[in-house]
UniProtKB/Swiss-Prot annotation:
Residues 30-141 form the STAS domain. GO terms for molecular function: anti-sigma factor antagonist activity. Gene3D superfamilies: STAS domain. Keywords: Stress response. Induction: Slightly induced towards stationary phase. Induced by heat and oxidative stresses. Belongs to the anti-sigma-factor antagonist family. Interacts with unphosphorylated OprA. PANTHER family: ANTI-SIGMA FACTOR ANTAGONIST TM_1081-RELATED (PTHR33495:SF2), ANTI-SIGMA FACTOR ANTAGONIST TM_1081-RELATED-RELATED (PTHR33495). This is Putative anti-anti-sigma factor Rv2638. It holds the Pfam family STAS. It comes from Mycobacterium tuberculosis (strain ATCC 25618 / H37Rv).
């Protein structure tokens, strides 16, 4: 896969230099950018997420979530992915729970029906709400109070 571009958002919690370096490895199959929009933080992912780069995906999602303050949300746009293994869904579900405890929604963006089918089959559709576009995910209001 091609070179990864990671743009840390200008916030008190940018992505770590180590993560930016690892994502920038020319042999990495994961591409990602982060961007802020008001209180929201967006991750735009491309390439592939599988067992070989699950650790990078988890670190990216965790570090990005740490930079979001309530009410957020954290929006993860996976429309640029060619492959999204089950490990990617598990990482998102784990982080969604941590975000909910902080009063932040994690919202997944995909227009691919298979993403919704996998989330539904894995029992994750309530944990990972899926929106067809970033704009619709941004327009859904706030998470409200923390709920663990």
């Amino acid at each position: 896969m091609g070179l990864i571009t990671t743009e840390p958002r200008s916030s008190p919690h940018p992505l770590s230099p180590r993560l930016v370096h690892e994502l920038g490895d020319p042999h990495s199959t994961l591409r990602a950018t982060t961007d802020g929009s008001g209180a929201a933080l967006l991750i735009h992912a491309g390439g592939e997420i599988d067992g070989r780069n699950e650790h990078l995906w988890r670190q990216l999602v965790t570090e990005a979530a740490a930079g979001v303050t309530a009410p957020g949300p954290l929006i993860v746009d996976v429309t640029g992915l060619d492959f999204m293994g089950c490990c990617a869904f598990a990482a998102l579900a784990d982080e969604a729970q941590r975000c909910r405890c902080r009063g932040i929604d994690l919202r997944l963006v995909s227009h691919q029906p298979i993403v919704a089918r996998i989330a539904e089959a894995g029992g994750l559709s309530r944990v990972l709400p899926i929106y067809p576009t970033v704009d619709t995910a941004l327009g859904k209001g706030t998470a409200g109070p923390a709920r663990c």
